[in-house]
Amino acid sequence: MITELHGIDIRENEPLKHYTYTKVGGPADFLAFPRNHYELSRIVAYANKENMPWLVLGNASNLIVRDGGIRGFVIMFDKLNAVHLNGYTLEAEAGANLIETTKIAKFHSLTGFEFACGIPGSIGGAVFMNAGAYGGEISHIFLSAKVLTPSGEIKTISARDMAFGYRHSAIQETGDIVISAKFALKPGNYDTISQEMNRLNHLRQLKQPLEFPSCGSVFKRPPGHFAGQLIMEANLKGHRIGGVEVSEKHTGFMINVADGTAKDYEDLIAYVIETVENHSGVRLEPEVRIIGENL
């Protein structure tokens, strides 16, 4: 127990596989769940003072944590999950569940968030990755974000400063961590919004292996191609390493079917990249983030 951080939910040597969508990941030295910005600031200030590394995991959806785990502090925003509406502006804390946030927008007949109705993860992770699907993405509705800098300062970043691109935002380079974000929505019709969300969720259920642990879409879309199509053409559908395999339902996904490890994921990703490049000449670029230490 760290005396200076008394009162904060901190768990020592906690296996991260219990918190990731892939169901893999070694232990965090310290896993912290701040309830508010004050507790978050205390954790970061302590870590910086002690020269301990720290990072935020978000909801750990489009992410693989290596089997050796993560040193220092891992911070999860599960308890920082409030969502507020001010007119047509929706503000959500970083730990707010993305899918649940789209439901709140729908309940208030606000349109703009429908594209994200089936994307797993948190608001903070969605901003970080500029998450998107079915022609929509976070940058289309983003107004601003309150972020925590690596030094512990809290500041506001505009949409322009975010420099959004395909599955990219400026904070991927700066190390700033989203605390909350504001989105500009528009008045809509509840039934129309609901029908569109039902349609998109039906498509997702038909095409994606939602019944298995996975890290979501593994690769970015290569220009002029679809990653899943290239993988299928290279005869990799169902290819398995250890407990992880290329999904037969959607070859752009890798699923944990038998107590797979992070090494299984990494080995399969590397094998798919090499095989697809040899077959088509196209080198796939991972969309999923891989962090932590090997065993």
Swiss-Prot record:
One of its GO terms (molecular function) is FAD binding. It is found in: Cytoplasm. Its EC number is 1.3.1.98. The gene is murB. Its cofactor is FAD. This is UDP-N-acetylenolpyruvoylglucosamine reductase. Pfam families: FAD_binding_4, MurB_C. Cell wall formation. Keywords: Cell cycle, Cell division, Cell shape, Cell wall biogenesis/degradation, Cytoplasm, FAD, Flavoprotein, NADP, Oxidoreductase, Peptidoglycan synthesis. It catalyses: UDP-N-acetyl-alpha-D-muramate + NADP(+) = UDP-N-acetyl-3-O-(1-carboxyvinyl)-alpha-D-glucosamine + NADPH + H(+). PANTHER family: UDP-N-ACETYLENOLPYRUVOYLGLUCOSAMINE REDUCTASE. Pathway: Cell wall biogenesis; peptidoglycan biosynthesis. HAMAP family: MurB. Residues 23-188 form the FAD-binding PCMH-type domain. One of its GO terms (cellular component) is cytosol. The lineage of its organism: Bacteria, Bacillati, Bacillota, Bacilli, Lactobacillales.
